[in-house]
Amino acid sequence: MAVFKGEVTALPPDKSISHRAALIGSLSEGVTEITNFSAGFDNQSTLGVLHDAGIEVSQHEIDGAYGRRIRKVIISSRGLWSFTAPEKPLMCNNSGSTMRMFAGILAAQPFESELVGDSSLMKRPMKRVADPLRQMGAGVDLSPAGTAPVRIRGTRDLTPLEYRLPVPSAQVKSLVTFAALHADGETRIIESIRSRNHTELMLGLETIDRPDGERVIVIPGRKTIVARSFYIPADPSAACFIVALGLLGSNSEIIIRDVCLNPTRVEFIPLLTGAGADITIENSRIIGGETIGDILVRSTRTLKPLVISNPTVVAGVIDELPMLSVLSAFSSGEFELHNAEELRTKESDRINAIVVNLERLGFDCEQYPDGFRVIGRRCRPVGQVTVACFDDHRIAMSFAVAARATGEGIALSDSDVVGVSFPNFFEIIENLKA
Protein backbone atom coordinates (compact mmCIF):
# COMPACT_ATOMS: atom_id res chain seq x y z
CA MET A 1 0.00 0.00 0.00
CA ALA A 2 1.23 3.49 -0.83
CA VAL A 3 1.97 6.17 1.78
CA PHE A 4 0.82 9.76 1.20
CA LYS A 5 1.93 12.70 3.30
CA GLY A 6 1.97 16.44 2.87
CA GLU A 7 0.03 19.63 2.31
CA VAL A 8 -2.25 20.33 -0.65
CA THR A 9 -2.37 24.04 -1.49
CA ALA A 10 -3.11 23.80 -5.21
CA LEU A 11 -6.53 22.18 -5.22
CA PRO A 12 -8.68 23.45 -8.11
CA PRO A 13 -10.87 26.45 -7.31
CA ASP A 14 -14.51 25.51 -6.79
CA LYS A 15 -16.32 24.77 -10.06
CA SER A 16 -19.79 25.71 -8.84
CA ILE A 17 -18.78 29.07 -7.38
CA SER A 18 -16.59 29.87 -10.41
CA HIS A 19 -19.53 29.32 -12.79
CA ARG A 20 -21.84 31.46 -10.70
CA ALA A 21 -19.35 34.27 -10.11
CA ALA A 22 -18.86 34.63 -13.87
CA LEU A 23 -22.58 34.52 -14.65
CA ILE A 24 -23.44 36.99 -11.88
CA GLY A 25 -20.64 39.24 -13.10
CA SER A 26 -22.21 39.26 -16.57
CA LEU A 27 -25.48 40.54 -15.02
CA SER A 28 -23.85 43.20 -12.84
CA GLU A 29 -23.32 46.87 -13.58
CA GLY A 30 -19.61 47.65 -13.55
CA VAL A 31 -16.44 45.59 -13.33
CA THR A 32 -16.47 42.23 -11.54
CA GLU A 33 -13.13 40.82 -10.37
CA ILE A 34 -12.91 37.08 -9.64
CA THR A 35 -9.75 35.90 -7.90
CA ASN A 36 -8.66 32.24 -8.06
CA PHE A 37 -11.00 31.36 -10.94
CA SER A 38 -10.97 27.74 -12.07
CA ALA A 39 -8.81 26.77 -15.05
CA GLY A 40 -10.93 23.63 -15.61
CA PHE A 41 -12.47 23.03 -19.03
CA ASP A 42 -16.05 23.48 -17.75
CA ASN A 43 -15.47 26.90 -16.22
CA GLN A 44 -13.54 28.05 -19.25
CA SER A 45 -16.60 27.06 -21.30
CA THR A 46 -18.69 29.49 -19.25
CA LEU A 47 -16.26 32.32 -19.97
CA GLY A 48 -16.34 31.33 -23.64
CA VAL A 49 -20.11 31.57 -24.02
CA LEU A 50 -20.18 34.90 -22.17
CA HIS A 51 -17.59 36.28 -24.58
CA ASP A 52 -19.45 34.94 -27.61
CA ALA A 53 -22.65 36.59 -26.32
CA GLY A 54 -21.04 40.01 -26.16
CA ILE A 55 -19.68 40.26 -22.61
CA GLU A 56 -16.17 41.66 -22.12
CA VAL A 57 -14.10 38.97 -20.39
CA SER A 58 -10.37 38.84 -19.67
CA GLN A 59 -8.19 36.63 -17.49
CA HIS A 60 -4.57 36.64 -16.44
CA GLU A 61 -2.28 35.04 -13.87
CA ILE A 62 -1.36 36.71 -10.58
CA ASP A 63 0.58 35.70 -7.47
CA GLY A 64 -1.56 33.83 -4.94
CA ALA A 65 -1.12 32.29 -1.50
CA TYR A 66 1.50 29.58 -0.86
CA GLY A 67 3.64 30.85 -3.74
CA ARG A 68 1.12 29.73 -6.36
CA ARG A 69 0.14 31.42 -9.58
CA ILE A 70 -3.63 31.78 -9.78
CA ARG A 71 -6.14 33.12 -12.32
CA LYS A 72 -7.91 36.43 -12.04
CA VAL A 73 -10.94 37.02 -14.27
CA ILE A 74 -12.31 40.48 -15.02
CA ILE A 75 -15.83 40.86 -16.43
CA SER A 76 -17.21 44.21 -17.60
CA SER A 77 -20.96 44.57 -18.06
CA ARG A 78 -23.73 47.16 -18.15
CA GLY A 79 -26.22 44.98 -16.28
CA LEU A 80 -29.07 42.58 -16.97
CA TRP A 81 -29.46 43.26 -20.69
CA SER A 82 -25.84 43.65 -21.78
CA PHE A 83 -25.77 40.67 -24.14
CA THR A 84 -25.77 40.70 -27.93
CA ALA A 85 -27.15 38.10 -30.32
CA PRO A 86 -24.43 35.51 -30.94
CA GLU A 87 -23.34 34.93 -34.52
CA LYS A 88 -23.15 31.14 -34.08
CA PRO A 89 -24.34 28.45 -31.65
CA LEU A 90 -22.83 28.88 -28.19
CA MET A 91 -20.47 25.97 -27.48
CA CYS A 92 -20.69 24.64 -23.90
CA ASN A 93 -18.36 21.67 -24.61
CA ASN A 94 -18.88 19.15 -21.76
CA SER A 95 -20.31 21.63 -19.25
CA GLY A 96 -23.91 20.92 -18.32
CA SER A 97 -23.68 23.68 -15.72
CA THR A 98 -22.87 26.22 -18.44
CA MET A 99 -25.70 25.08 -20.69
CA ARG A 100 -28.37 24.90 -18.01
CA MET A 101 -27.60 28.06 -16.05
CA PHE A 102 -26.82 30.29 -19.04
CA ALA A 103 -30.15 29.24 -20.58
CA GLY A 104 -31.86 31.18 -17.78
CA ILE A 105 -30.05 34.37 -18.78
CA LEU A 106 -30.60 33.89 -22.52
CA ALA A 107 -34.34 33.40 -21.94
CA ALA A 108 -34.53 37.07 -20.91
CA GLN A 109 -32.55 38.50 -23.83
CA PRO A 110 -34.48 39.93 -26.82
CA PHE A 111 -32.91 37.67 -29.45
CA GLU A 112 -32.66 34.05 -30.54
CA SER A 113 -29.77 31.86 -29.44
CA GLU A 114 -28.70 28.23 -29.45
CA LEU A 115 -26.70 26.23 -26.90
CA VAL A 116 -24.75 23.16 -28.03
CA GLY A 117 -22.11 20.88 -26.52
CA ASP A 118 -19.87 17.91 -27.15
CA SER A 119 -21.24 14.47 -27.97
CA SER A 120 -21.70 13.64 -24.28
CA LEU A 121 -23.54 16.85 -23.35
CA MET A 122 -25.80 16.60 -26.40
CA LYS A 123 -27.23 13.37 -24.95
CA ARG A 124 -28.09 14.78 -21.52
CA PRO A 125 -31.73 15.63 -20.64
CA MET A 126 -32.71 19.29 -20.88
CA LYS A 127 -36.49 19.16 -20.37
CA ARG A 128 -36.13 20.41 -16.80
CA VAL A 129 -34.39 23.46 -18.28
CA ALA A 130 -37.10 24.16 -20.82
CA ASP A 131 -40.19 23.73 -18.63
CA PRO A 132 -39.78 26.66 -16.19
CA LEU A 133 -38.49 29.00 -18.90
CA ARG A 134 -41.54 28.24 -21.05
CA GLN A 135 -43.76 28.94 -18.05
CA MET A 136 -42.10 32.35 -17.75
CA GLY A 137 -42.80 33.17 -21.41
CA ALA A 138 -39.60 32.27 -23.26
CA GLY A 139 -39.60 30.05 -26.31
CA VAL A 140 -37.43 26.96 -25.82
CA ASP A 141 -37.04 24.13 -28.33
CA LEU A 142 -35.17 20.87 -27.75
CA SER A 143 -34.42 17.82 -29.86
CA PRO A 144 -37.21 15.20 -30.14
CA ALA A 145 -35.38 13.29 -27.39
CA GLY A 146 -35.55 16.28 -25.03
CA THR A 147 -31.84 17.00 -25.32
CA ALA A 148 -29.65 19.76 -26.76
CA PRO A 149 -29.42 21.72 -28.94
CA VAL A 150 -31.31 24.17 -26.73
CA ARG A 151 -32.83 26.82 -28.99
CA ILE A 152 -34.09 29.87 -27.13
CA ARG A 153 -36.32 32.73 -28.27
CA GLY A 154 -35.73 35.21 -25.50
CA THR A 155 -37.97 38.04 -24.35
CA ARG A 156 -37.59 41.08 -22.11
CA ASP A 157 -41.11 40.38 -20.79
CA LEU A 158 -40.59 37.29 -18.66
CA THR A 159 -43.40 36.62 -16.19
CA PRO A 160 -42.56 36.02 -12.51
CA LEU A 161 -43.85 32.77 -11.07
CA GLU A 162 -43.93 30.50 -8.05
CA TYR A 163 -41.91 27.46 -9.06
CA ARG A 164 -41.62 24.22 -7.13
CA LEU A 165 -38.46 22.32 -8.03
CA PRO A 166 -39.51 18.85 -9.25
CA VAL A 167 -36.14 17.38 -8.23
CA PRO A 168 -33.33 18.72 -6.04
CA SER A 169 -31.15 20.55 -8.57
CA ALA A 170 -28.98 23.57 -7.86
CA GLN A 171 -28.56 24.10 -11.60
CA VAL A 172 -32.30 24.32 -12.28
CA LYS A 173 -32.74 26.52 -9.21
CA SER A 174 -30.01 28.81 -10.52
CA LEU A 175 -31.32 29.04 -14.09
CA VAL A 176 -34.78 30.00 -12.79
CA THR A 177 -33.13 32.54 -10.48
CA PHE A 178 -31.13 34.10 -13.31
CA ALA A 179 -34.25 34.33 -15.48
CA ALA A 180 -36.29 35.72 -12.57
CA LEU A 181 -33.81 38.55 -12.04
CA HIS A 182 -35.12 39.95 -15.35
CA ALA A 183 -38.85 39.40 -14.67
CA ASP A 184 -41.27 42.22 -13.87
CA GLY A 185 -42.11 41.19 -10.31
CA GLU A 186 -41.17 38.76 -7.56
CA THR A 187 -40.47 35.08 -8.23
CA ARG A 188 -40.47 32.41 -5.53
CA ILE A 189 -38.72 29.06 -5.82
CA ILE A 190 -39.75 26.26 -3.47
CA GLU A 191 -37.42 23.34 -2.77
CA SER A 192 -38.47 20.34 -0.70
CA ILE A 193 -34.99 18.84 -0.63
CA ARG A 194 -32.14 21.29 -0.13
CA SER A 195 -29.47 21.67 -2.81
CA ARG A 196 -26.29 23.74 -2.88
CA ASN A 197 -27.07 27.39 -2.13
CA HIS A 198 -24.18 29.35 -3.66
CA THR A 199 -26.40 31.39 -6.00
CA GLU A 200 -28.63 32.57 -3.15
CA LEU A 201 -25.64 33.48 -1.00
CA MET A 202 -23.79 35.30 -3.76
CA LEU A 203 -26.86 37.35 -4.74
CA GLY A 204 -27.89 37.98 -1.13
CA LEU A 205 -31.40 36.61 -1.73
CA GLU A 206 -34.00 36.23 1.00
CA THR A 207 -34.72 32.62 1.99
CA ILE A 208 -37.64 31.46 4.13
CA ASP A 209 -37.53 28.14 5.97
CA ARG A 210 -41.03 26.73 6.45
CA PRO A 211 -42.04 24.58 9.45
CA ASP A 212 -42.59 21.62 7.08
CA GLY A 213 -38.91 21.72 6.09
CA GLU A 214 -39.40 23.35 2.71
CA ARG A 215 -37.31 26.37 1.77
CA VAL A 216 -38.53 29.34 -0.28
CA ILE A 217 -36.08 31.52 -2.22
CA VAL A 218 -37.39 35.01 -3.01
CA ILE A 219 -36.06 36.69 -6.17
CA PRO A 220 -36.96 40.34 -6.83
CA GLY A 221 -37.09 41.20 -10.51
CA ARG A 222 -35.25 43.96 -12.34
CA LYS A 223 -33.13 45.10 -9.41
CA THR A 224 -29.72 46.52 -10.23
CA ILE A 225 -26.89 44.15 -9.37
CA VAL A 226 -23.79 46.10 -8.46
CA ALA A 227 -20.48 44.57 -9.57
CA ARG A 228 -18.31 43.21 -6.77
CA SER A 229 -15.24 41.08 -6.17
CA PHE A 230 -15.33 37.33 -5.60
CA TYR A 231 -12.72 34.94 -4.16
CA ILE A 232 -13.09 31.29 -5.16
CA PRO A 233 -12.12 28.74 -2.46
CA ALA A 234 -10.87 25.22 -3.22
CA ASP A 235 -13.41 22.77 -4.61
CA PRO A 236 -14.73 20.32 -1.95
CA SER A 237 -15.70 17.81 -4.64
CA ALA A 238 -12.05 17.75 -5.71
CA ALA A 239 -11.00 17.53 -2.05
CA CYS A 240 -13.07 14.35 -1.72
CA PHE A 241 -10.64 12.51 -4.01
CA ILE A 242 -7.66 13.55 -1.88
CA VAL A 243 -9.54 12.61 1.29
CA ALA A 244 -10.17 9.15 -0.14
CA LEU A 245 -6.51 8.84 -1.12
CA GLY A 246 -5.46 9.63 2.45
CA LEU A 247 -7.96 7.18 3.95
CA LEU A 248 -6.96 4.30 1.65
CA GLY A 249 -3.21 4.93 1.89
CA SER A 250 -1.00 3.35 4.53
CA ASN A 251 0.18 5.54 7.44
CA SER A 252 -0.89 8.60 5.47
CA GLU A 253 -1.58 12.13 6.69
CA ILE A 254 -2.69 14.92 4.34
CA ILE A 255 -3.89 18.46 5.03
CA ILE A 256 -5.92 20.20 2.31
CA ARG A 257 -5.91 24.00 2.57
CA ASP A 258 -8.62 26.62 2.00
CA VAL A 259 -11.48 24.33 1.00
CA CYS A 260 -15.07 25.54 0.62
CA LEU A 261 -16.89 24.08 3.64
CA ASN A 262 -20.40 25.21 2.72
CA PRO A 263 -22.63 22.68 4.54
CA THR A 264 -24.45 21.84 1.29
CA ARG A 265 -21.12 20.82 -0.28
CA VAL A 266 -19.30 18.74 2.36
CA GLU A 267 -21.94 16.25 3.42
CA PHE A 268 -19.49 13.51 2.43
CA ILE A 269 -17.42 14.37 5.53
CA PRO A 270 -20.03 13.42 8.19
CA LEU A 271 -20.85 10.34 6.12
CA LEU A 272 -17.22 9.24 6.27
CA THR A 273 -16.59 10.18 9.91
CA GLY A 274 -19.74 8.24 10.79
CA ALA A 275 -18.13 5.23 9.11
CA GLY A 276 -15.00 5.66 11.23
CA ALA A 277 -12.85 7.91 9.02
CA ASP A 278 -10.18 10.04 10.73
CA ILE A 279 -11.05 13.49 9.32
CA THR A 280 -10.71 16.83 11.13
CA ILE A 281 -11.69 20.38 10.13
CA GLU A 282 -9.23 23.12 11.08
CA ASN A 283 -8.93 26.91 10.65
CA SER A 284 -12.60 27.43 9.75
CA ARG A 285 -13.59 31.01 8.83
CA ILE A 286 -16.06 32.99 6.68
CA ILE A 287 -14.96 34.70 3.43
CA GLY A 288 -17.51 36.31 1.13
CA GLY A 289 -20.40 34.53 2.81
CA GLU A 290 -18.85 31.07 2.39
CA THR A 291 -17.26 28.94 5.11
CA ILE A 292 -13.66 28.07 4.25
CA GLY A 293 -11.18 25.91 6.14
CA ASP A 294 -8.61 23.11 6.08
CA ILE A 295 -9.31 19.36 5.98
CA LEU A 296 -6.90 17.02 7.81
CA VAL A 297 -7.21 13.34 6.87
CA ARG A 298 -5.32 10.34 8.27
CA SER A 299 -5.28 6.72 7.11
CA THR A 300 -8.35 4.72 8.05
CA ARG A 301 -7.98 1.53 6.08
CA THR A 302 -11.09 -0.24 7.38
CA LEU A 303 -14.30 1.77 7.26
CA LYS A 304 -17.80 0.62 8.09
CA PRO A 305 -19.71 -0.05 4.85
CA LEU A 306 -21.55 2.99 3.49
CA VAL A 307 -25.30 2.64 2.92
CA ILE A 308 -26.79 5.76 1.31
CA SER A 309 -30.52 5.93 0.59
CA ASN A 310 -31.97 9.10 2.16
CA PRO A 311 -32.93 11.37 -0.79
CA THR A 312 -31.66 14.47 1.02
CA VAL A 313 -28.28 12.84 1.67
CA VAL A 314 -28.09 11.55 -1.91
CA ALA A 315 -28.71 15.06 -3.25
CA GLY A 316 -26.02 16.45 -0.95
CA VAL A 317 -23.30 14.06 -2.15
CA ILE A 318 -24.39 13.53 -5.76
CA ASP A 319 -20.99 14.56 -7.18
CA GLU A 320 -19.03 12.59 -4.59
CA LEU A 321 -20.93 9.30 -4.98
CA PRO A 322 -18.49 7.75 -7.50
CA MET A 323 -15.56 8.28 -5.13
CA LEU A 324 -17.54 7.28 -2.03
CA SER A 325 -18.67 4.03 -3.64
CA VAL A 326 -15.18 3.06 -4.82
CA LEU A 327 -13.70 4.02 -1.44
CA SER A 328 -16.26 1.94 0.46
CA ALA A 329 -15.79 -1.03 -1.86
CA PHE A 330 -12.00 -1.07 -1.47
CA SER A 331 -12.08 -0.31 2.27
CA SER A 332 -14.96 -2.42 3.58
CA GLY A 333 -15.80 -4.59 0.59
CA GLU A 334 -19.38 -3.34 0.68
CA PHE A 335 -21.51 -0.39 -0.47
CA GLU A 336 -25.21 0.22 -1.07
CA LEU A 337 -26.98 3.12 -2.82
CA HIS A 338 -30.64 3.90 -3.54
CA ASN A 339 -32.68 6.94 -4.70
CA ALA A 340 -29.85 8.09 -6.98
CA GLU A 341 -31.50 7.96 -10.43
CA GLU A 342 -29.89 11.36 -11.08
CA LEU A 343 -26.52 9.60 -11.48
CA ARG A 344 -27.74 8.09 -14.74
CA THR A 345 -28.01 11.55 -16.36
CA LYS A 346 -24.55 12.91 -15.53
CA GLU A 347 -21.57 13.01 -17.92
CA SER A 348 -22.07 9.25 -18.11
CA ASP A 349 -24.54 6.79 -16.65
CA ARG A 350 -22.50 6.76 -13.47
CA ILE A 351 -24.38 3.88 -11.86
CA ASN A 352 -23.56 1.63 -14.79
CA ALA A 353 -20.01 3.00 -15.13
CA ILE A 354 -19.16 2.29 -11.48
CA VAL A 355 -20.69 -1.19 -11.52
CA VAL A 356 -19.02 -2.20 -14.80
CA ASN A 357 -15.61 -1.17 -13.49
CA LEU A 358 -16.00 -2.67 -10.02
CA GLU A 359 -17.01 -5.96 -11.64
CA ARG A 360 -13.92 -5.81 -13.87
CA LEU A 361 -11.90 -5.48 -10.68
CA GLY A 362 -13.50 -8.58 -9.22
CA PHE A 363 -16.26 -7.14 -7.03
CA ASP A 364 -19.68 -8.79 -6.92
CA CYS A 365 -22.33 -6.11 -7.62
CA GLU A 366 -26.07 -5.79 -8.11
CA GLN A 367 -27.43 -2.88 -10.16
CA TYR A 368 -30.85 -1.25 -9.63
CA PRO A 369 -32.68 1.50 -11.54
CA ASP A 370 -31.87 3.97 -8.75
CA GLY A 371 -28.56 2.64 -7.45
CA PHE A 372 -26.47 -0.46 -6.85
CA ARG A 373 -24.93 -2.71 -4.23
CA VAL A 374 -21.40 -4.04 -3.74
CA ILE A 375 -22.07 -7.35 -2.05
CA GLY A 376 -18.82 -7.97 -0.22
CA ARG A 377 -17.25 -10.77 -2.19
CA ARG A 378 -14.25 -10.14 -4.41
CA CYS A 379 -12.27 -12.36 -6.74
CA ARG A 380 -9.19 -10.23 -7.42
CA PRO A 381 -8.18 -10.42 -11.11
CA VAL A 382 -4.71 -11.50 -12.17
CA GLY A 383 -2.62 -8.92 -13.99
CA GLN A 384 -3.46 -5.39 -15.05
CA VAL A 385 -7.09 -4.35 -15.55
CA THR A 386 -8.12 -1.35 -17.65
CA VAL A 387 -11.14 0.50 -16.29
CA ALA A 388 -13.37 2.42 -18.69
CA CYS A 389 -13.60 6.15 -17.97
CA PHE A 390 -16.73 6.69 -20.12
CA ASP A 391 -15.51 10.24 -20.91
CA ASP A 392 -16.35 11.09 -17.28
CA HIS A 393 -13.83 12.91 -15.10
CA ARG A 394 -15.27 11.67 -11.80
CA ILE A 395 -15.23 8.03 -12.89
CA ALA A 396 -11.61 8.41 -14.01
CA MET A 397 -10.44 10.04 -10.78
CA SER A 398 -12.33 7.65 -8.50
CA PHE A 399 -10.59 4.60 -9.94
CA ALA A 400 -7.27 6.43 -10.26
CA VAL A 401 -7.34 7.04 -6.49
CA ALA A 402 -7.99 3.35 -5.87
CA ALA A 403 -5.14 2.40 -8.21
CA ARG A 404 -2.60 4.77 -6.63
CA ALA A 405 -3.55 4.00 -3.03
CA THR A 406 -3.73 0.21 -3.30
CA GLY A 407 -0.89 -0.32 -5.75
CA GLU A 408 -3.05 -2.71 -7.76
CA GLY A 409 -2.59 -3.02 -11.50
CA ILE A 410 -5.37 -0.67 -12.57
CA ALA A 411 -5.04 1.38 -15.77
CA LEU A 412 -7.38 4.08 -17.09
CA SER A 413 -8.80 4.07 -20.60
CA ASP A 414 -8.59 7.89 -20.79
CA SER A 415 -6.77 9.81 -18.07
CA ASP A 416 -6.92 13.16 -19.92
CA VAL A 417 -10.62 13.55 -19.07
CA VAL A 418 -9.68 14.63 -15.51
CA GLY A 419 -8.86 18.04 -16.99
CA VAL A 420 -12.57 18.84 -17.06
CA SER A 421 -12.45 19.69 -13.36
CA PHE A 422 -9.03 18.83 -11.90
CA PRO A 423 -6.18 19.54 -14.36
CA ASN A 424 -3.40 18.98 -11.80
CA PHE A 425 -4.94 15.84 -10.25
CA PHE A 426 -2.09 13.45 -11.07
CA GLU A 427 0.57 16.04 -10.21
CA ILE A 428 -0.88 16.49 -6.71
CA ILE A 429 -0.99 12.74 -6.10
CA GLU A 430 2.63 12.33 -7.19
CA ASN A 431 3.72 15.17 -4.90
CA LEU A 432 1.98 13.50 -1.93
CA LYS A 433 3.81 10.19 -2.28
CA ALA A 434 6.06 9.73 0.75
Curated annotation (Swiss-Prot):
Please indicate if the UniProt record lists Repressor as a keyword.
Answer: no
- HAMAP family of this UniProt entry? EPSP_synth (MF_00210)
What does the record give as its pathway? Metabolic intermediate biosynthesis; chorismate biosynthesis; chorismate from D-erythrose 4-phosphate and phosphoenolpyruvate: step 6/7
The EC code for this enzyme is 2.5.1.19
Q: Give the disulfide map.
A: none
Entry binding sites for 3-phosphoshikimate? 15-16, 20, 169, 171, 195, 319, 346
Q: Which residues form a coiled coil?
A: none
Protein's recorded name: 3-phosphoshikimate 1-carboxyvinyltransferase
Q: Extract the InterPro entries matched here.
A: Enolpyruvate_Tfrase_dom, Enolpyruvate_Tfrase_sf, EPSP_synthase, EPSP_synthase_CS, RNA3'P_cycl/enolpyr_Trfase_a/b
The similarity annotation says:
Belongs to the EPSP synthase family.
Keywords for this entry?
Amino-acid biosynthesis, Aromatic amino acid biosynthesis, Cytoplasm, Transferase
Q: Where is the active site?
A: 319
What main location does UniProt list? cytoplasm
Q: Where does phosphoenolpyruvate bind?
A: 15, 96, 124, 171, 350, 394
Q: Which GO terms describe its molecular function?
A: 3-phosphoshikimate 1-carboxyvinyltransferase activity
Which NCBIfam families does the protein's record reference?
Answer: aroA
* Biological processes per GO annotation: amino acid biosynthetic process; aromatic amino acid family biosynthetic process; chorismate biosynthetic process
